[in-house]
Structure formats: structure tokens, C-alpha cells
Regions:
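Noncatalytic, beta-rich nucleic-acid-contacting surfaces in large DNA/RNA-processing enzymes
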Residues: 1-316
Length: 316
């Protein structure tokens, strides 16, 4: 698609978007408040308090046991920390020790140093470590003299697609008039810009290793927005939020069992189903989350609606 000059886009259908919408409806019903997710403050300490507590069940992308343990160790205090975590918490970076290195540098346990002081503006936000594809592109421009277009087509794309051999085996024509491999252009450009061969080689070697887990910042930033929004909703409206999470899994008994257990672990009471109190869906009350009739195994939405209709017609 890209070779044809057309824009390629991925549209994700995320359950989380439905959960957020339902949670907002629950909050509106119980408190009369219209929540606008775009106005949720990302500097709210309650977001990071929730993450640090490990009570992240139902929070987008950060509810697995491994991720929960990592967040508790990391102790994020800013949105940018969450963005980096989303990019790093994958098999490649975990195996390479990048996660622990980032956390140690972030918390002052290791020196946060870049390869060269002139690259601090590029690597400063990630404490001297390469985390995003965009950072590799910027280094190729700043240190090696690549044009922005060359940094995308001749560094980012081969790295993202793990076509590492192309970087050292294919001679290309460059905008400065030279004909050489990407590796040679990288090294020659760095030396021309007064970087040492040792620094240029070290970064190149790290870029090749980085290729196994390179992630783009825009993707991480988008996902991190949902992390922040769902964490904020759970922190401030736990009953309404977890009712939305449980409702989203209606018909999936194993998931309901998991999240009921998680609610109780997090101190959120789950009230038993009641023919006189329960709705079709899980509902949020002052006391906790009321089990929805449709969430009972073997009942289903149709039967639940019939029970409620009879209750409304004939009374409790």
C-alpha cells in the first residue's frame, strides 16, 4: 500500500472504548456528572497512586501480573513514564534488560547518560536509552546528516521490518550525492560531524539490537492515553468503572469470575444478584457493584430482560 503512495491506517476495535463509554454513563446516572475523557488531568496524583498500589485490574494494558509488578517497581509519576513503559514492556526489551535499565535510570539508581552530550535533547526524556523508533531517526539526522526522508526510508523502515542486512549490503544513492551503504553513510556522516568512530559504532550496534523491539512513540502515546483515562476512572469512580468492565464481559464466565475476584481484592464489594434489585447488566451502587442478571451462567440477556419486565409489571 505504501509503495503505491497511499496512506495506510490501522483501525483498532478496542473493548476499552466501550468500557469508558459505559463507565461515563454509569457516572452520569449516579452523580449527574458528564465526564469528558479529553479533559481528564494526566497529572492527577490519584492515577499514579492507583498504579503504584497494584490495583490495576480492568485498567487498559497494565493489568497483567507482570505489568503490575513492573509498574509497582517503576513508580511512574508522569504520563511520559507510562508511554515508555508501553513501548518497553514486550519480549525484546524485557529480554535485553531495557526495562530494568530504564527504571533504574529513572529512579536515580543508574546514571542517566547519553552517548554524547549533543544527543541529550533526543535521549533526555528516556534517560539516555533508545526507546522509540523516532529517536533513532532523530539521531541519524543530528549525528549523521541524514535528511528526514532518508531517516524514515533508510533507517526506520528497515529497522521496523527487521531487514538488517539491507543496512550493510545495499549501496544506495544519497541526497548529498554519495553512493554507499546505510552503514557507511552513518559512519562517514558521524565522523564528518565530529563524533568519534567509537560513539558512532556503539550507537549503530545498539540500533541493530534495538531493531528486535523497535516501537514508535505515537503508538505508545495513543495507548498510554487510554491507560491514563481508565486509571483515572477507576481511581475516582471504582464502582461505576468496574461495573462497566464486568458488563463488557457478559456471557464470558471465566472473565466475570476473574474480575469479581479482582474487585474484592481491590476492596470493591460485589453484591449478589437479586431479582428485586439487579438489572440486566452489572450496576454501580453506593455499596458496590450489583451483579447483573445476564451475568449469571445459563440466564442470558433474554431471560434477564423477561425477569425485569415481570418485576416492573407486577412489582417485587
Amino acid at each position: 500500500v505504501a509503495d503505491m503512495g497511499l496512506l495506510k491506517m490501522d483501525f483498532l476495535g478496542l473493548r476499552t472504548l466501550t468500557v469508558i463509554s459505559k463507565a461515563k454513563a454509569n457516572i452520569k446516572k449516579n452523580f449527574g456528572i458528564d465526564i469528558k475523557e479529553e479533559e481528564i488531568p494526566f497529572d492527577d496524583p490519584e492515577i499514579f497512586k492507583l498504579m503504584g498500589s497494584g490495583h490495576t485490574a480492568g485498567v487498559f494494558q497494565v493489568e497483567s501480573a507482570g505489568m503490575t509488578a513492573t509498574i509497582k517497581n517503576m513508580k511512574p509519576t508522569e504520563y511520559k513514564h507510562v508511554v515508555a513503559l508501553i513501548a518497553l514492556y514486550r519480549p525484546g526489551p524485557l529480554g535485553a534488560g531495557m526495562v530494568s535499565s530504564y527504571i533504574n535510570r529513572m529512579n536515580g539508581k543508574e546514571p542517566a547518560v547519553s552517548y554524547d552530550d549533543r544527543l541529550d535533547d533526543i535521549l533526555g526524556e528516556t534517560y539516555g536509552t533508545m526507546v522509540y523508533q523516532e529517536q533513532v531517526m532523530l539521531i541519524s539526522v543530528e549525528m549523521c546528516g541524514f535528511s528526514k526522508g532518508e531517516s524514515d526510508s533508510r533507517i526506520r523502515k528497515p529497522v521496523a521490518k527487521k531487514k538488517i542486512k539491507l543496512l550493510t549490503s545495499t549501496v544506495l544513492h544519497w541526497e548529498d550525492g554519495s553512493d554507499e551503504t546505510t552503514y557507511d553513510h552513518w559512519m562517514n556522516g558521524a565522523i564528518k560531524n565530529n563524533y568519534t568512530r567509537e560513539v558512532a559504532q556503539k550507537i549503530w550496534d545498539d540500533v541493530l539490537e534495538f531493531a528486535s523491539y523497535a516501537f514508535n512513540k505515537s503508538h505508545s502515546a495513543g495507548y498510554a492515553i487510554l491507560v491514563m483515562q481508565t486509571a483515572w476512572l477507576k481511581a475516582h469512580y471504582p464502582h461505576e468503572y468496574m461495573a462497566a468492565v464486568l458488563t463488557s464481559y457478559t456471557g464470558k464466565t471465566d472473565k466475570i469470575v476473574h474480575y469479581v475476584s479482582a474487585c474484592r481484592h481491590d476492596g470493591i464489594p460485589v453484591l449478589s444478584p437479586d431479582v428485586n434489585e439487579s438489572g440486566t447488566e452489572f450496576t454501580a451502587t453506593k455499596e458496590g457493584v450489583r451483579f447483573g442478571l445476564a451475568g449469571i451462567r445459563g440466564v442470558g440477556t433474554g431471560v434477564a430482560q423477561a425477569i425485569i419486565a415481570e418485576r416492573e409489571a407486577g412489582g417485587p
